[in-house]
C-alpha cells in the first residue's frame, strides 16, 4: 500500500455527502450536472485544486497524497494536543511538556515528518511506531478520532473546491483570486453549517472539521511554507471568517480549541495570549488581531 492514508480513500470520496447528509441529494445533483470527480496524485506540496477537462466538460478535484497525509497528521496532533493540554490544566501544572508523554511525542514526530514530506519528495514512507490511519473502526481510539476529524476537515476542503465550480470561478490565477477564495470559503461553510440551529448536535463536529482545516493551513504558514501565497486570504483571516459567523453553543468549545492550538503554533513568535477576555470568542478575536499585526510587519 502506497500509504496508510489509502485506507480512507473511499471515506474521503463520500465525505462531502456525509458531512451534511440532509443535503445529500442536492449535492448529488451538482456533482452529476457539473461532472465533478475526485482524483489522488503522488506529488509534493499542498496543491489541492480543481481543473477542467475541456474534452468532456468535467471538473476534477485533485488531492495529493502528501497533503492528505499532512491533514491527517495535523488532525491527530490537534486531538492529542488538546486532550493532553486539558489534562495539564486540570492538574494545575505550571508547564506543558510536548516531549514528556509518549502519546504526544509520537503525534508531534508524525506531524514533523508529514511537513517535511510535504515540502520535499511527497512520497516518503510513513514512519514506523507513529500513529496512522486504519480501516474504518480499526486502530487505536486516537487513530479513530483523528480519522473522524480528518474526514470532516477534508469534507470542507472538498466543498471549497466544489464551490469554485458552482460559483463559476475561472480556474486560473487572476487579480480576483483572493476574493474568489473568500467566496468559496463562505459557500462551503454555509453549505455545511447554514441550516443547523445553534443547539444542533451535529454543529460542533462539523465546525471542528472546518476549524481543523483552516488551522492546518495556518500551521504551514507559521512555518513560512507559503503554499497558498498571493492566491488565498491569510489563514488567520479564514479562521475568523469561517468560525466566528456561526455560534456553536455557549461554552464556546471551538473557539477555545482554536485559541489553544494557535497559542501553540505561535509560541515562538512573541505573541502572548490575553486570557483575561470576557469570553473565548473575545480572546480568539484579540489573538487573531495580534497575528494579523505580526504577519503584516
Swiss-Prot record:
Q: Which UniProt keywords apply?
A: Cell membrane, Hydrolase, Membrane, Protease, Transmembrane, Transmembrane helix
Q: State whether keyword Hydrolase applies.
A: yes
Bilayer-crossing regions = 61-82, 149-178
One Gene Ontology CC term in the entry:
plasma membrane
The record gives the membrane topology as:
Multi-pass membrane protein
The record's section on InterPro entries has: Peptidase_U49_Lit_pept
GO process annotations (BP): proteolysis; regulation of translational elongation
Localization recorded for this chain is: Cell membrane
- Domain of life, per lineage: Bacteria
| Major location (coarse) | membrane
Please name one Pfam family that this protein belongs to. Peptidase_U49
Q: Name one GO molecular function term.
A: peptidase activity
Task: Name the job this protein performs.
Answer: Interacts with a short DNA sequence about one-quarter of the way into the major capsid protein gene 23 of T4; general translation inhibition occurs when this late gene of the virus is expressed.
- Entries under NCBIfam families matching the protein: PRK09672.1
- Report the family membership: Belongs to the peptidase U49 family.
Q: Give the protein's recorded name.
A: Cell death peptidase
Organism listed in the record: Escherichia coli (strain K12)
Q: Which gene encodes it?
A: lit
Amino acid at each position: 500500500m502506497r500509504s496508510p492514508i489509502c485506507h480512507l480513500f473511499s471515506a474521503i470520496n463520500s465525505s462531502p455527502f456525509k458531512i451534511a447528509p440532509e443535503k445529500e441529494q442536492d449535492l448529488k445533483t451538482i456533482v452529476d450536472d457539473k461532472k465533478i470527480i475526485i482524483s489522488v496524485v503522488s506529488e509534493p506540496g499542498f496543491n489541492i485544486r480543481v481543473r477542467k477537462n475541456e474534452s468532456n466538460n468535467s471538473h476534477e478535484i485533485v488531492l495529493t497524497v502528501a497533503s492528505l497525509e499532512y491533514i491527517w497528521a495535523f488532525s491527530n496532533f490537534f486531538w492529542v494536543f488538546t486532550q493532553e493540554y486539558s489534562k495539564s490544566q486540570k492538574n494545575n501544572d505550571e508547564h506543558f511538556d510536548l516531549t514528556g508523554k509518549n502519546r504526544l511525542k509520537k503525534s508531534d514526530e508524525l506531524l514533523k515528518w508529514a511537513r517535511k514530506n510535504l515540502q520535499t519528495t511527497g512520497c516518503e514512507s510513513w514512519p514506523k511506531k507513529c500513529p496512522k490511519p486504519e480501516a474504518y473502526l480499526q486502530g487505536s481510539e486516537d487513530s479513530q478520532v483523528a480519522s473522524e476529524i480528518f474526514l470532516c476537515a477534508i469534507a470542507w476542503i472538498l466543498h471549497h473546491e466544489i464551490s469554485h465550480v458552482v460559483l463559476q470561478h475561472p480556474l486560473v490565477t487572476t487579480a480576483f483570486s483572493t476574493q474568489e477564495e473568500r467566496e468559496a470559503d463562505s459557500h462551503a461553510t454555509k453549505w455545511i453549517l447554514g441550516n443547523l440551529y445553534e443547539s444542533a448536535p451535529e454543529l460542533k463536529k462539523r465546525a471542528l472539521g472546518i476549524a481543523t482545516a483552516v488551522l492546518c493551513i495556518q500551521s504551514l504558514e507559521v512555518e513560512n511554507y507559503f503554499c497558498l501565497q498571493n492566491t488565498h486570504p491569510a489563514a488567520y483571516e479564514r479562521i475568523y471568517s469561517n468560525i466566528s459567523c456561526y455560534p456553536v453553543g455557549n461554552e464556546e468549545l471551538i473557539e477555545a480549541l482554536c485559541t489553544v492550538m494557535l497559542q501553540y503554533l505561535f509560541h515562538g513568535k512573541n505573541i502572548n495570549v490575553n486570557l483575561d477576555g470576557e469570553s473565548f470568542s473575545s480572546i480568539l478575536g484579540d489573538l487573531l488581531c495580534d497575528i494579523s499585526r505580526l504577519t503584516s510587519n
